């Protein structure tokens, strides 16, 4: 079998069936995905990664995880953002954004020591990821001290409800403390009460700020959450 572009070929296997994201792969697709993993060292996302074990680690991402990260985000959108969270016509036409090259760069050369990309899963597989760093300049609240931000946290639909998201968030909070942040923020969609409930359970609270976002192809509002980090790990 000839694999001309391992990233594109693996993403084609992930996206070809549309939504809802399948929880099983055909034998032919599974063989192709495993071939890509063996030949190129590419980490596999679900459904090719199977289900996470109880001892799956949280680790710093490498370039080998980039395709899996892109795939997890695409699959999570299709599972979590239907039903009015985002417009169906946008979801029907969505692409891989950002591209795999973005995640390769993020893993290989972080913008600063205050940026970190984490994945949930042993080397060779990924079930979720978290991207973190300083608060984006457009989102800085001048009334607050310098803060860190969780830019993105996605867990694959197959792996949700198994504690990986909470562990990613806890690991990120420990790292934020280590690099000197006492306060962290993140955004959720106003139309996504499930995500808001998750963050509340992890100790995050709304700041009261609502930020309108217009990407041209889709517009929505984001709700800002924040949490103060104390030195005792709470």
Language-model segments: residues:
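Conserved N-terminal entry element of GNAT/NAT acetyltransferase domains
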Residues: 2-67, 81-84, 223, 230-234
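Acetyl-CoA-dependent GNAT
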Residues: 11, 36-41, 60-64, 74-84, ...
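Residues within well-ordered alpha-helical secondary structure of globular protein domains
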Residues: 16, 72-75, 174, 201
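A short, polar/charged loop/turn motif at coil->beta-strand junctions and beta-hairpin connectors
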Residues: 52-55, 126, 144, 219
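Residues at or immediately flanking beta-strands
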Residues: 57, 117, 183-185
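C-terminal "cap" of GNAT-fold acetyltransferases
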Residues: 146-148, 182-185, 189-205, 209-234
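Glycine-rich phosphate-binding loop
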Residues: 159-163
């Amino acid at each position: 079998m000839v694999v001309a572009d391992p990233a594109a070929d693996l993403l084609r296997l992930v996206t070809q069936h549309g939504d809802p994201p399948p929880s099983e792969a055909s034998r032919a697709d599974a063989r192709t995905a495993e071939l890509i993993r063996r030949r190129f060292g590419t980490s596999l996302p679900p459904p090719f990664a199977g289900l996470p074990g109880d001892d799956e680690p949280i680790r710093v991402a490498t370039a080998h995880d980039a395709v899996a990260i892109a795939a997890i985000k695409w699959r999570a959108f299709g599972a979590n953002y239907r039903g009015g969270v985002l417009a169906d016509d946008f979801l029907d036409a969505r692409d891989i954004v950002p591209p795999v090259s973005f995640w390769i760069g993020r893993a290989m050369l972080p913008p600063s020591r205050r940026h970190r990309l984490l994945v949930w899963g042993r080397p060779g597989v990924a079930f979720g990821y978290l991207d973190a760093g300083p608060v984006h300049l457009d989102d800085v609240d001048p009334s607050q001290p310098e803060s860190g931000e969780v830019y993105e946290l996605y867990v694959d639909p197959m792996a949700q409800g198994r504690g990986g998201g909470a562990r990613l968030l806890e690991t990120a909070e420990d790292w934020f403390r280590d690099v000197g942040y006492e306060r962290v923020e993140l955004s959720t969609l106003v139309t996504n009460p499930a995500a808001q409930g998750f963050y509340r359970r992890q100790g995050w609270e709304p700041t009261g700020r609502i930020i309108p976002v217009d990407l041209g192809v889709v517009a929505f509002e984001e709700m800002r959450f924040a949490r103060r980090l104390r030195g005792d790990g709470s």
